[in-house]
Swiss-Prot record:
Domain comment as written in the entry: Domain I is involved in oligomerization and binding regulators, domain II is flexibile and of varying length in different bacteria, domain III forms the AAA+ region, while domain IV binds dsDNA.
Compartments where located: Cytoplasm
Residue numbers spanned by region Domain I, interacts with DnaA modulators: 1-87
Subunit structure, interactors included: Oligomerizes as a right-handed, spiral filament on DNA at oriC.
Keywords: ATP-binding, Cytoplasm, DNA replication, DNA-binding, Lipid-binding, Nucleotide-binding
Keyword Magnesium among record annotations: no
Family named by the database record: Belongs to the DnaA family.
Region (Domain II): 87-124
Name this protein carries in UniProt: Chromosomal replication initiator protein DnaA
Length: 461
């Protein structure tokens, strides 16, 4: 009784949560009755703690409504349901079964097949330097790292495919390699293939030229895990999309892991067939956002430590407050500072950094101003620039204004009173409220989260 109600509870959670929240936290759960206790199994401690903190009250309330005093006790545990019976898992009716165009062998993850010679060097494409241990985690990438870690521990499981999207230089490629390293560590003979999407296209073209398309198909459909970076470069390449469509179906039928990255949300990728974009969303889709200030500082401190440099805290904060677009830009700036310090023998101070990064800092300050933010946000939401400064409080105007205030705090060095002055002489408390409101909405609303990320990318590019 309780186990069947658990499936109904899952259905309610699916209705109440966003697709990403459901896929991330609820779908991996399994449940089994032990006496008068319903044991809910989570794949790892991170998922367990999150579900218990965020969703325990909803689960308890559901069982109390359905069973009253007979509601079972709940217990959380890490692992898989031990029973040999079919698992009661939150995966039903989530993903359609792919229809393969023809019969395809379905090797299990534990039994990789012999590797054709077509691309035998792909195994070396997993970079051993990219690990989870040296990936700096923050709010901007926390979900992405958690999902990637889960995939590395349980490839071909609940998060398949895993789709990571976000701007350039935010750590998507790092996570792909970290997953590959995790899989190979747990199973050294696993066939894990990482590549840029253009390499897939090149391999297919070469196979066509050499009359080796069947070997190409056999290779890609036999791998244990396929990671493709920048899938948006498949745009308008019809033959490549056709071949990848069938490869995708074959791998998913065999429970082999697929991870894809892009600079855009799947449905926003132009030039890619709808049937592919639909499949990209079958598993879990996670945004990797530009790092917030604390994460940027942590990245700089980690990079300096790896380089054997003692970076003063105030210098790290100075750089992090001024360079905000992506991790690659941060690391490049720090490398320049370190190189200048080594060449000149001078200590790394704020004044030294101002001098070493003079052109970069000047360009950044020129590009991102409150006026530029206001114009960009007004254009994005299709409102008049005058509305940004007006007293109008309708949501269609107030929300973009709050967004612009939050972005001004994030992307400029202006104080709250200075930002308020730029928005029609508003008080600094109004700006603070706007920043907190947008931060809250980014947690609750997928649309607001997307808008914020899109605007950050536009303003930082």
């Amino acid at each position: 009784m309780a186990v069947s109600l658990w499936q109904q509870c899952i259905a309610r959670l699916q209705d109440e949560l966003s697709a990403q929240q459901f896929s991330m936290w609820i779908r991996p759960l399994q449940a089994e009755m032990e006496g008068d206790t319903l044991v809910i199994y989570a794949p790892n401690r991170f998922v367990l703690d999150w579900v218990r903190d965020k969703y325990l009250n909803i689960i308890n309330q559901f069982f109390t409504e359905q069973m009253g005093a007979d509601a079972p006790k709940l217990r959380f545990d890490i692992g898989s349901r031990p029973s040999a019976k079919p698992v009661v898992q939150a995966t039903a009716a989530i993903r359609p079964k792919p229809a393969a165009s023809k019969a395809v062998e379905k090797p299990t993850f534990n039994a990789p097949q012999a590797e054709p010679a077509i691309t035998a060097n792909h195994r070396s494409n997993i970079n051993p330097t990219y690990q989870f241990d040296n990936f700096v985690e923050g709010k901007s990438n926390q979900l992405g790292k958690a999902a990637a870690l889960q995939v590395s521990e349980n490839p071909g499981g609940a998060y398949n495919p895993l789709f990571l999207y976000g701007g350039t230089g935010l750590g998507k490629t790092h996570l792909l390699h970290a997953v590959g390293n995790g899989i190979i560590k747990n199973k050294p003979d696993a066939k894990v293939v990482y590549m840029h999407s253009e390499r897939f296209v090149q391999d297919m073209v070469k196979a066509l030229q050499n009359n080796a398309i069947e070997e190409f198909k056999r290779y890609y459909r036999s791998v244990d895990a396929l990671f493709i970076d920048d899938i948006q470069f498949f745009a308008n390449k019809d033959r490549s999309q056709e071949e990848f469509f069938h490869t995708f179906n074959a791998l998913l039928e065999g429970n082999h892991q697929i991870i894809l990255t892009s600079d855009k949300y799947p449905k926003e990728i132009d030039g890619v067939e709808d049937r592919l974009k639909s499949r990209f969303g079958w598993g879990l889709t996670v945004a990797i956002e530009p790092p917030e200030l604390e994460t940027r500082v942590a990245i700089l401190m980690r990079k300096a430590q790896e380089s054997g440099i003692n970076l003063p805290d105030e210098v790290a904060f100075f750089i992090a407050k001024r360079l905000r677009s992506n991790v690659r830009e941060l690391e490049g700036a720090l490398n320049r500072v370190i190189a200048n310090a080594n060449f000149t023998g001078r200590p790394i101070t704020i004044d030294f950094v101002r001098e070493a990064l003079r052109d970069l800092l000047a360009l950044q300050e020129k590009l991102v101003t409150i006026d530029n933010i206001q114009k960009t946000v007004a254009e994005y939401y299709k409102i008049k620039m005058a509305d940004m400064l007006s007293k109008r409080r309708s949501r269609s105007v107030a929300r973009p204004r709050q967004m612009a205030m939050a972005l001004s705090k994030e992307l400029t060095n202006q104080s709250l009173p200075e930002i308020g002055d730029a928005f029609g002489g508003r008080d600094h408390t109004t700006v603070l409220h706007a920043c907190r409101k947008i931060a809250q909405l980014r947690e609750e609303s997928h649309d607001i989260k997307e808008d914020y990320a899109n605007l950050i990318r536009t303003l930082s590019s």
